[in-house]
């Protein structure tokens, strides 16, 4: 297992065996940009989280299966409670939406080695959900202020 503390995020990863014929890799990362951006007075506060995994199983020397996945969550809030509400920050807040995005991909590949030939069967599924929300003057108290 290995951990990483970066300038804008923290993460952990691990890999190894899950038995005699199976191996794994996994990692997770999360940003703390929202705290840094708040400290330096920026009007938006982004946060991201992502994770990935891979599992590989060898049935025998001629057949193997690999399953993998990745996913991410992006979340950007507006820093409307700033002490320094400069004209520049007011302008940025006037047009920036709140952003919420989720995405993932899952996949698998089955490989069969036959002499000099390789046969593969591959399946995958991906999805992205993207939601941007903007209220006039960032006032969420009235539904009619919703503009995006």
What residue ranges belong to the model's regions?
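Solvent-exposed loop/turn segments connecting transmembrane beta-strands
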Residues: 1-11, 45
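A generic beta-sheet turn/junction motif
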Residues: 5-9, 18-19, 112-116
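Structured loops at beta-to-helix junctions and adjacent beta-edge loops in soluble globular domains
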Residues: 5-6, 29, 70, 122-124
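Short alpha-helical segments and helix-capping/turn motifs at coil-helix boundaries
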Residues: 8-10, 50-51, 103-106
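Structural motif
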Residues: 9-11, 32, 118
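Residues on the lipid-exposed face of transmembrane beta-strands in outer-membrane beta-barrel proteins
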Residues: 12-16, 53-57, 108-112, 148
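Periplasmic-side early beta-strands and strand-to-turn transitions of outer-membrane beta-barrels
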Residues: 17-99
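Flexible loop and strand-edge segments within Gram-negative outer membrane beta-barrel domains
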Residues: 64-113, 119, 125-147
């Amino acid at each position: 297992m290995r951990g990483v503390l970066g300038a804008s995020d923290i993460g952990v990863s691990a890999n190894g065996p899950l038995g005699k014929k199976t191996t794994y890799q996994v990692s997770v990362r999360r940003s703390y940009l929202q705290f840094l951006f708040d400290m330096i007075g920026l009007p938006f506060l982004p946060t991201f989280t992502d994770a990935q995994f891979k599992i590989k199983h060898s049935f025998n020397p001629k057949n193997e299966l690999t399953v993998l996945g990745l996913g991410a969550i992006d979340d950007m809030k507006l820093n409307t409670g700033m002490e320094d509400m400069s004209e520049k920050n007011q302008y940025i807040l006037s047009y920036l939406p709140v952003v919420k995005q989720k995405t993932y991909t899952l996949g698998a590949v089955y490989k069969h080695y036959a002499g000099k030939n390789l046969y593969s069967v591959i399946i995958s599924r991906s999805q992205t959900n993207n939601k941007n929300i903007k209220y006039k003057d960032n006032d969420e108290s009235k539904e009619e202020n919703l503009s995006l």
